[in-house]
Regions:
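GAF sensory/regulatory domain recognition
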Residues: 37-40, 47-74, 99-100
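Signal-transducing coupling segments at domain and membrane junctions
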Residues: 59, 68-69, 96-118
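Acidic/proline- and glycine-rich, intrinsically disordered low-complexity segments
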Residues: 69-93
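A short, aliphatic-rich beta-strand micro-motif
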Residues: 117-125
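Signal-transducing coiled-coil/dimerization helices and immediately adjacent hinge/linker segments
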Residues: 168-196
Length: 196
């Protein structure tokens, strides 16, 4: 179970742990997972995701509380659902109870019917461009302050922008290398003389 501490210092504890992870973790996806782990332990987060924008699509890059199949289902178009709307507008969005909001798509199929859970989604911006989103499902009780949580997640999203941009760049470089290798294999197979 996550250890929630709603003291006035919660934000400082979360930011200190995340900034330490940013300094020490070089792998972008591992860093994003570490950040989600901090949010789980400190904020009553049930599930969380970082998405990366690729063209007009958003794909889950890292998650907490989702298995591989659920992550694969977490594919959105910009403008679609809450996550897509946040990516389109660059503005955060809070849903106090996802079971009562028809805009919430539950694409990953991880939410149970009737489960009272809040959803907070914030944009991740790098060089004035929305490059992804950070979203969490959060348990709600009488001490929940969703506005405070949203503000904290906005700060986290702002400081993670560079790391997510690096992860996006690594994906693009990897895709370019794979495409180049495929092209070379095809040339080698069909026209080996053209390689000389």
């Amino acid at each position: 179970m996550n250890e929630i501490n709603r003291s006035p210092d919660l934000e400082m504890v979360v930011l200190k742990e995340i900034s330490s992870a940013i300094v020490n973790e070089r792998n972008g996806t591992a860093l994003l997972r570490h950040i989600l782990d901090v949010l789980y332990r400190r904020m009553k987060m049930l599930r969380g995701t970082f998405t990366i924008r690729r063209g007009n699509d958003l794909m889950i890059e890292a998650s907490h509380g989702l298995d591989e199949q659920e992550m694969k289902r977490g594919h959105y178009h910009v403008g679609e659902g809450i996550t897509g709307h946040v990516a389109e507008t660059g503005r955060p969005h809070v849903i106090e109870d996802i079971s009562r909001d028809s805009r919430f798509l539950n694409r990953t199929r991880t939410r149970k019917s009737g489960e009272k859970v809040a959803f907070i989604c914030v944009p991740i911006i790098h060089l004035q461009q929305v490059i992804g989103t950070l979203s969490i499902d959060r348990a709600v009780d009488r001490d929940t302050d969703l506005e405070r949580d949203q503000k904290l997640l906005e700060i986290v999203g702002n400081i993670v922008g560079d790391a997510l941009a690096a992860s996006l760049q690594a994906h693009e470089e990897r895709a370019a290398l794979v495409a180049e290798n495929e092209k070379l294999r095809e040339l080698l197979t069909t026209n080996p003389g053209e390689l000389i």
